[in-house]
């Protein structure tokens, strides 16, 4: 499903003043990665390859499901090794601030 997760991320997006970042989620079993760009109050999200990424994250669909269902944070997924990431870790930590799925 090409729309998986997109509406959920949109619904939970909390704009961050003066914050810009580009994320690429490689979700196991999906042909295309999930690209997410935050530009202050604007969120761009779609499936497809993009350049100039700040944080690459790799995870299984079950882990992404746990995150968007509010059972786990991005930070916890990373700390437990259920999500691997490379790039700017300060930008990685912002994910839980911008997308509070746990409330």
Question: What is each PLM-predicted segment?
Answer:
Residues 1-103:
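Feature captures hydrophobic
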